[in-house]
Regions:
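C-terminal cap/substrate-recognition subdomain and adjoining C-terminal extension
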Residues: 1-202
Length: 202
């Protein structure tokens, strides 16, 4: 049955029937039946990824690739990305909030509000050819009007242009005039794409 989480429910007992019964069945499956199966070993090895784990994953990635933090582009959207954002920015990498919560928007260097991931592809292409400064030049309203012509190869720009066609896409940096308005715009897009309940997480 569908499990409806009502706004006034503070505990499982507050949920309308048959939600408590369904939750009890799921509990038995996940805590009794699955651990007894061979596949249950996988669940024992799973490490939920929070803020410290994401920051550690960034460091581990750099250790494996022999790159530096300045080479890093990190895209995140919630409070669990803040520690990674801070580490990346401290090391001169690029931290991008993509339809992020208030925490993500405030911690990132560049903020993307969009209804598809194509803007991220465009920013990565700019980074590859022009570096982080190229992205900041495009994102900053003070330099956008007088910025250089950041030319991308046709093989790169054509698929990106097709992907961006008809899409909603706004780009900001921390110098945005009204950052609170940017936060609201980012969270509204997040809710539109992911649903209110999921968007409210972190």
């Amino acid at each position: 049955p569908e499990i409806e989480l009502t706004p006034d429910a503070a505990a499982e007992a507050d949920l309308p029937a048959p939600a408590p019964e369904a939750i009890a069945v799921l509990d038995r499956i996940f805590w009794e039946r699955l651990p007894a199966m061979e596949i249950g070993a996988i669940y024992q090895e799973v490490n939920p990824v929070g803020g410290p784990e994401k920051a550690k994953a960034v460091a581990d990635s750099l250790a494996q690739t022999k790159l530096t933090m300045a080479d890093m582009v990190y895209v995140g959207d919630s409070i669990t990305d803040v520690q990674a954002f801070e580490a990346v920015r401290a090391g001169s990498g690029l931290a991008i909030s993509f339809n992020g919560t208030r925490h993500a928007v405030n911690a990132a260097e560049v903020i993307v509000v969009a209804d598809s991931a194509w803007p991220i592809a465009m920013l990565i292409a700019i980074v590859q050819l022009w570096g982080k400064e190229g992205v900041l030049e495009v994102a900053c309203p003070e330099t956008r009007a007088k910025s250089r012509c950041l030319v991308l190869p046709e093989a790169v720009i054509e698929p990106i242009a097709r992907g961006l066609e008809g899409r909603l896409f706004n780009l900001y940096d921390q110098s945005a005039e009204n950052l609170d308005q940017v936060v609201e715009e980012s969270q509204a897009m997040r809710a539109k794409l992911r649903g209110e309940a999921v968007a409210a997480l972190g």
